[in-house]
Amino acid sequence: MSSFNLDLETSEIIVKDDIFVEDDGFSENGEDNRWTEQQKREVGNAVVFSTDWTTETIINQIHKGNIELNPNFQRRDAWTSKEKSRFIESLMLGFPIPPIVLAVNNLDRGKYIVLDGKQRLLSLYSFFSNDRERVPPLKLTGLKVKDEFNNLTFEKMQSLPECTHDIAFLENQPIRTIVIKNYPHESFLYEVFLRLNTGSKPLSPQELRQALHPGSFTSYLDVRAANSNVLKDILNRKTPDFRMRDVELLLRELSYVFFLKEYDGDLKSFLDNTCKTLNKNWESIRNKVEEYCDEFEKAHEFTKSIFGKDAYRKYLKGEFVNRFNRGILDSMAFYFVESDVRDYLKDKKNNVYNAFIELCKTDSLYMDAIESTTKTIPATRYRIVRWGSVLKDLGAPVNIPELDER
């Protein structure tokens, strides 16, 4: 395999709106949500209102597909059965719960993007779903007050006359729902998303990207990442990441290989553009994307065969630092996805190992490019080009990209 370059018009991936994973210096965060002066002026165009939808109304909206919860949500469900059950119990008891925050999709009126409350909505769907082939029934567990309902599913409760009142109360329980209409741009939604989650467990904006830019490519990426043992190994997880950091990681590396020359220092916009472009051109580029994902997995196995448990760790003060570094993954995956590079280096693994250690020990610019100001164009360029030059010095047939030194 010689190249993953796509024959697509570059104009297709120029997008004005920038939106959007954990902030480790390489990922998207709130500081990257750049607003133009015009975008600032347009904030007042958004309409925000509150309404009290009943539980039954919300469930009907989910069943109709108007509230999209991700078809593959079961693989990325963050709450346990006990946590879901306690939420259902809170509704049964009429306890106050946090509001759901939705945005009316500007591109598909009548459809809603979930900005806050996804796990609560998933809990309702698990309990009330009318599609049990797709969604296993939630069996209530860990209830403290309504403990007579422990071990019961919604279907079982429906068959018990003594549950009739509780079911009716639950279905008619109002849930405060905040709705945003006419949002001026995607950066607005991203800012709302960030502020809703300030102070809570960090969330991945990849979830929002999946909702804003659904399509064949983003669906493929979700399923591929969820099924990838390699991504679980890289992120040290046993299950798919419920905040979709595995999806973002695969998207990031794919974007660098396909569209590196288009990178302008704005990671959110860069990844967003990739989704838009590949969704639009999915039928023509599907084979190349699938081939890349296959080769990415081989690249990881090759890297592990060289560095073992120290793969994607920087070397500092005589030892490997015990922390995954995305910048090193950028460097290595960019070249090791090429089968001819792997084939050439398979008998030179010790040379690669020692060359990387020497690079970390002697090249302060490379260390800066994987440690600080990592998303800038010079840092991105340097860590990829510099590692390519190291491999080239070993004789590997690498294609080092010619990048603007902006």
Q: What kind of region is each of these model predictions?
A:
Residues F4-I14, F20-N29, T36-E37, R41-N60, ...:
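Basic- and aromatic-enriched surface patches that contact anionic nucleotides/nucleic acids
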Residues L250, L254-R406:
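C-terminal subdomains that position terminal phosphate/3'-OH groups for nucleotidyl transfer/ligation
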